[in-house]
Amino acid sequence: MTSTIKDVAALSGFSIATVSRAINAPHTVGPDTLATIRAAIETLQFRPNPLGRQLRSDRTQLIGVILPTFANPVFTECLQGLDELASQAGFKLIVMTTEYDTARERHAIETLRAQRVEGLILTVADAHAHPLLDALDRDGLLYVLIHNDTPHRPSVAVDNRQAAYDGVSHLIARGHRRVLMLAGSLAASDRARQRHLGYAQALADHGLEPLPALEIDFNAPELPNAVLAHLTSKATRPTAIFCSNDLLAMVVMRGLRRAKFRVPDDISVLGFDGLAIGELLAPPLASVATPNREIGRSAWRRLAERRAGETHAAPALVLPHTVRDGGSVTAIGDALDTGCGNGHGPDGAHGLDTHD
């Protein structure tokens, strides 16, 4: 005979209403109660009818997740943290990617709303000026931003500007005076722009001149000529490169090696994200490390709190970052502060065509 919710209530010792809440809104039930009810459900092999539950409660147990890309492990690590807690709560995630395109962000939001998701967890190109987020606020669809650090919207992130400031200050403390920043498209990412502001502020606060940031495609197979031109000219050669993310730093380290530069003997490289794979490189990548999986977990908790009617005085949750030292950064002395290298670096292009 098929078990019913009454059977689960009788075996667990809780009311039918409590069992129903454990099934339909597990975040509203205490962990011990939830564990007891789930044990009874498994013992009885009770399987709720999902269609009937949706029709009765107008609930889908679906949460939409919008990420820029799966290519960057930052977002997949975050998704792992999200999925961990979503599964425990009995929810399913519908995940879409946007490739940092605002039109695709709009399409993703519209698609997920048509799927009747009960909330959104998302990263957008620019959270500070985003009419679609304003529309979600007006319509009452709950959401939490991840990696977008904006003080006026519900979000979970690190302080990107402060994190970059601390990373560049770490380079300065190691003796570097000419630090070049490489980034993807600054226009496509408010996070990259905040990191650039932190980079520039750190140098300015130490009485140093920020260099113009170079924007490159981290999917490109080779370092662009513009970067190589900086590195092969004694007048413009930096002693360290700060990359706006770890994937870019890995591309840079590969390009430097192919151009006969040694990291860190000829030039130091600092990334941003703290990806575990960076520690497997030779030399291990120094990086500003962010708690990516915990960002996902915290975003889920924030969304659950919003769905339960809880509010926070500060809608933005800022998680701590750390500067992870690594073999890709070395200390240099006063004689090296001019940015002319340590005597081992190349003085020319080494056969590379640095022109278009």
Where is each model-derived feature located?
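Short, well-structured alpha-helical segments in soluble
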Residues: 105-116, 223-236
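N-terminal helix-turn-helix DNA-binding module of bacterial transcription factors
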Residues: 1-60, 343-344, 353-356
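Flexible loop/turn connectors
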Residues: 211, 225-356
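Short acidic/polar active-site loop segments enriched in Thr and Asp
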Residues: 15, 61, 118, 176-178, ...
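Hinge/beta->alpha junction and helix N-cap segments in small-molecule ligand-binding domains
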Residues: 68-77, 95-104, 156-166, 182-227, ...
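Flexible loop/hinge segments that line or gate small-molecule binding clefts
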Residues: 100, 122-166, 247, 273-285, ...
